[in-house]
Amino acid sequence: MTRTPVPGTRRRILQTAARLFKEHGARAVGMQQVVEETGLGKSALYREFTSKDELVRAWVAELHDHAWAQIDSAIARHEGDPARQLLAVVEHAQESTQDSDAHGCTFYNTSAEFRDPGHPGRREAVDHLERLRERLSALATAARATDPDALADMLMLIISGLYANAATLGPSGPAARSVAAARILIDQHVPAHVPTPEGRRA
């Protein structure tokens, strides 16, 4: 007889897994630990997620959606000024490291933990980072940067360095200079402009 899933079970599992993955790293946490922490039986867990790989993938996918909602919101605050929107992405990244419990960037961390290119969680993490790079390049193109792809790549390096430094040396260390570094970089690659309501240069 097939048991009917209890409403909220999937959410409960994901919330518990997210906490454990953040505290111990996704690779170090086993399915049995998730079972014990949720208080659910193994059958309930495996009914929602057929394997740990699938659980990690779902966790990263959920973080991906949450991160993009925040990035889109940061960008939307500077509509019509793509150069300022580029800086807003870095500002958002810096703000996200202010939490004293921050452990770096989940997407970079997951990619480092699961080295197999075919791992579902790693694929989700890499997809997020590739989309971020593409978004930065598109904004740089809209801002008429001299070399949009180069500017996007250098901003990606600032963002990754920001997360790494904030996690090790704290948000008040070198990470605190990330926005200033990004501003200098953007100013060097984007000609001076006056944004118009349509987002075009005057």
Per-range role (PLM):
Residues S43:
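Key DNA-contact positions within bacterial/archaeal DNA-binding proteins
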Residues Y46-F49, D53, E113:
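A short His-aromatic
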Residues V56-L63, Q70:
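Alpha-helical DNA-contacting segments of helix-turn-helix folds
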Residues A58, D72-H103, A142, A152-L155:
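Hydrophobic alpha-helical connector segments
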Residues V60, H64, R122-E130:
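Amphipathic, non-transmembrane alpha-helical scaffold segments
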Residues G118-D127, T141-A202:
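Hydrophobic/aromatic-rich alpha-helical bundle segments in the mid-to-C-terminal region
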